[in-house]
UniProtKB/Swiss-Prot annotation:
Position of the signal peptide: 1-33
Gene from which the chain derives: opgG1
GO BP of this protein: beta-glucan biosynthetic process
UniProt source species: Shewanella oneidensis (strain ATCC 700550 / JCM 31522 / CIP 106686 / LMG 19005 / NCIMB 14063 / MR-1)
Keywords annotated in UniProt: Periplasm, Signal
Subcellular location: Periplasm
Annotated GO CC locations: outer membrane-bounded periplasmic space
Family statement drawn from the similarity comment of this UniProt entry: Belongs to the OpgD/OpgG family.
Coiled-coil intervals, chain numbering: none
SUPFAM superfamilies, sorted: E set domains, Galactose mutarotase-like
Protein name as it appears in the record: Glucans biosynthesis protein G 1
Region (Disordered) residue spans: 36-58
UniProt GO molecular function: carbohydrate binding; catalytic activity
Annotated pathway: Glycan metabolism; osmoregulated periplasmic glucan (OPG) biosynthesis
Length: 544
């Protein structure tokens, strides 16, 4: 059985930092979005190549990590190990006061000039653009370009950026560094370099599969998520981006992570496609024992759907970046847990041993379900995490935070190891991320396609709840009708009905729940066939 943690109620102040960072990062993918333009063999204006190493200047920002010099696969690991051997230092880098006070509209008015994109003049399959510092993004992030085992520090160049009419102040000439970067690739159309991936804000990053629009995000590491004393947000302080090959569909990014509790070295091997794959290799060097740590964390948004529209006044039927948490556990079960926007913060932990995969999924791909011409939620990518090797005992943790606005990311998932990671140790782990419409391979299986609920009596108000769960069959529907088994941790289940659903090439399960005096009930539904068949198990947490 699935082991679940009882939810705890926390003061709103404990999650404000999380919401602010998530909202800020949500802006980063669009704040600098320029119109995609075809690749040109001969740009109309002079091309700016990656800068060479320059002599130190009084106006140059101190380079701490990405110093020009030799670089190999162990360079970042050595830096992280050395960093963790010393007490954590809060880095403060000078920045004109006006940049810190920029409004959202002013900040998005600072745009990277596509003509200055790194590698634009070299005919490579990838290009790179940097983000300016300012607004919420005030940390200086160091960046280096790696070629032939040689790292070259990428100094700030004001000529890389243009300022529109909204921002009134001039851009600085001093080397103030960058706040992050994004990678472009001919993901959707030959000759057009679209955004593929963004690194900006703490340890946040996100990517796209073919045809996707930015939605959920990932992080390098989660620490103390939903902790009453507040969450700790590690930061990627520096990046080393390897120059891609002409004939390769691969770009490699190295990153140095730091926080009061831990330092770490990360390697991201990125392969764009229908489902963009990112192989992540990480080594953590804890300064303190990590007892509240989350590996491979994802952050998303769920406002409402047919699964729950309480107190909703919205013309759109559904509003979410993800609609469910999918898990393939070590026992071979496939579990589907619809997301919710609860009235109180909820934390669920799904115990496992050697997980095979988990991720926040956007399963509903129909525009009619969202009716939002601008947000295009049907294009938001799913994110599937496949552990490499045996991750041992632990739990997939799901955090659902109440929100009244879609600008706030309120969903977090990650893997929490059962045993704390000791201080002074070296902890290595690896996993594959798949970003796209369908990152999980289809099989001849039965999957949950829709969850809806409402009051059980349409004639009058009642506390009794009706649940409707639709299943879709990938393949030919068998003649037999499966048996339905519904369990609950409290209340009374009644009127369980299973029927064929020709419109969905599958089945519809309906049942009623009488909560009685409970304010939180765990639900579990299974379909049983006479012959072996992979069927998703439906899980749900009902709350008042």
């Amino acid at each position: 059985m699935v082991s679940l943690l009882r939810c705890q109620s926390f003061k709103p102040s404990s999650i404000i930092c999380s919401l602010a960072l998530s909202a800020a990062f949500a802006l980063s993918g669009t704040a600098f979005a320029d119109e995609s333009k075809p690749a040109e063999n001969k740009p109309a204006t002079p091309v700016v190549s990656p800068p060479k190493a320059t002599a130190p200047s009084a106006n140059k920002t101190q380079v701490r990590f990405t110093k020009t010099g030799t670089f190999d696969g162990d360079s970042v690991v050595k830096l992280a190990r050395k960093l963790a051997s010393k007490p954590y230092v809060v880095l403060k880098d000078p920045m004109p006061a006006g940049l810190a006070k920029l409004t959202y509209d002013e900040y998005r008015d600072i745009r990277f000039n596509p003509v200055s994109s790194i590698w634009r003049d070299q005919g490579l399959p990838f290009q790179m653009q940097m983000f300016h510092r300012g607004f919420y993004f005030q940390d200086l992030i160091e960046i280096a370009i790696v070629e032939a085992n040689q790292a070259t520090h990428l100094a700030y160049e004001p000529k890389y950026f243009t300022a529109g009419e909204v921002i009134t102040q001039a851009l600085p000439n001093d080397d103030i560094g960058y706040s992050g970067f994004r990678i472009h690739n001919q993901l959707n159309t030959n000759g057009v370099f679209d955004e593929l991936m963004v690194f900006q804000g703490a340890s946040y990053f996100r990517a796209l599969g073919k045809g996707n629009a930015y939605g959920l995000s990932a992080r390098g590491l989660a620490l103390k998520t939903a902790d009453p004393e507040g969450e700790e947000f590690p930061i990627f302080r520096a990046f080393w981006v390897e120059r891609p090959s002409y004939d390769s569909n691969l770009i490699v990014v190295h990153a140095l992570l730091d926080s009061p509790s831990v330092a770490g070295a990360y390697r991201f091997s990125v392969r764009p496609g229908d489902n963009t794959q990112i192989d992540v290799e990480a080594t953590l060097f804890p300064r303190v024992e990590l007892s509240k740590v989350g590996l491979a964390p994802s952050t998303s948004m769920f406002l409402h759907s047919l699964n729950g529209r309480h107190d909703t006044d919205d013309f759109r039927p559904e509003v979410h970046d993800s609609d469910g948490l999918l898990m393939f556990n070590g026992r071979g079960e496939h579990l589907w847990r619809p997301l919710a926007n609860p009235r109180q913060l909820q934390v669920s932990a799904f115990s496992d041993n050697s997980p095979q995969g988990f991720g926040l999924i956007q399963r509903e791909r129909n525009y009619a379900s969202y009716q939002d011409l601008e947000a295009q939620y049907e294009r938001r990518p799913s994110l599937w995490i496949e552990p490499v090797g045996n991750w041992g005992q632990g739990a997939v943790v799901l955090t659902e935070i109440p929100t009244e606005s879609e600008i706030h990311d309120n969903i977090v998932s990650f893997w929490k190891p059962r045993q704390p990671i000791p201080a002074g140790s070296e902890y290595h782990f690896a996993y594959r991320m798949s970003w796209g419409d369908e990152p999980v391979a289809k099989t001849n299986s039965v999957v949950v396609s829709r969850t809806a609920s409402g009051r059980a009596d349409i004639a009058k108000a009642t506390p009794r709840r009706l649940f409707v769960v639709d299943y879709h069959l990938n393949g030919t529907m068998p003649d037999e009708l499966p048996l339905a088994k519904v369990e609950s941790s409290g209340g009374v289940i009644s009127n369980v009905v299973i029927a064929r659903n020709a419109a969905n090439n599958g089945y519809r399960l309906a049942f009623e729940l009488e909560p009685e005096d409970k304010d939180l009930i765990e639900l579990r539904a299974e379909l049983k066939f006479s012959t072996p068949r992979q069927v998703e198990t439906w899980l749900y947490r009902w709350t008042l």
